[in-house]
Amino acid sequence: FDPLDTEFGAYFMNYHSRAPIFSGHGAPASAYSGAGLVGGLVGNGVPLGVAAGLAPTLLPLVVAGNSSYYVEYPEDIRLYGLSFSTTLPTGTAWSGELSYRPNAPVQLNTTDILFSGLTPLNPNVSVLQGTPGQDQQGYRRKEVTQLQTTLTHFFDQVMGAERLTLVGEVGWTPVGGLESNSKARYGRDPSYGPGPLPNNQCVTLNSGTLAGGPQNNVSRYCENDGFTTANSWGYRGRAIWEYNDVFAGVNLKPNVAWSHDVEGYSPGPGGNFEEGRKAVSLGVDA
């Protein structure tokens, strides 16, 4: 086994993202005026006392209704990569790749973006602070590295098959420059709610969202699980059997695949690993 009997590769790319980033635009300053809302209600025939009582409840709705949201596609992402490929003395093919993006756009938590438009009314509803009439960009650029290695081995005449192919892969994704979760949070599906907020605001927001529904889970996801972490890793495995000329010249390749995201949450959109996620799949190619 000659360690230099190996193919090496290096590459560089500058590309534009095809994955959409969710961003927001704050309502105009006039939408935040409680006095203006009361005046508008009175002008439409609502008694002053009633209008003043309704204003605190209606004002967040007015602000949300005058805000806007959009998707954007960040440009000029730099990608540097190194790779190798060799064959071990056992006949096992071994390959690996290291990629580095010094300015990768990472999606901020979309729930924080949504509620940031309300922070001029209540600064505790989001860890992101919004400004009336200004954009709330949905991403920040971070250093993202991806390291993966793959082993492939062939076995002939196994289980009645001409060949059995086993493939195993391990991947690791470190992210540099992440802020503490009290300053900025990345990733996590919005269906899990806002996460921890000052003054128990997470429970308050969940209670409002679930108004009229069961209230027993309002604090269940007021935690930091699910947000992008500095490290994440997992592994994949696949087995493929090759049966030639099974009938009428048809070749069949049944396969089974297994994946396990062991620890951490990768940056999005489209992160590779979500801690605890497991999947198995069966298939047949002909």
Predicted segments with their positions:
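Residues on the lipid-exposed face of transmembrane beta-strands in outer-membrane beta-barrel proteins
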Residues: 1, 10, 82-86, 96, ...
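Short loop/turn motifs that connect adjacent beta-strands in outer-membrane beta-barrel proteins
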Residues: 2-7, 21, 85-91, 156-166, ...
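Transmembrane beta-strands of outer-membrane beta-barrel pores
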Residues: 12-18, 100-104, 153-155, 170-176, ...
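Solvent-exposed loop segments that connect transmembrane elements
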Residues: 20-70, 108-136, 179-223, 266-268
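Outer-membrane beta-barrel proteins
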Residues: 68-72, 84, 135-139, 223-229, ...
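Residues that define the transmembrane beta-barrel architecture of outer-membrane proteins
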Residues: 76-80, 143-147, 231-235, 274-280
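Hard-cation-handling environments
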Residues: 85-109, 142-144, 148, 152-171, ...
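C-terminal structured "cap/appendage" subdomains that terminate the fold
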Residues: 261-286
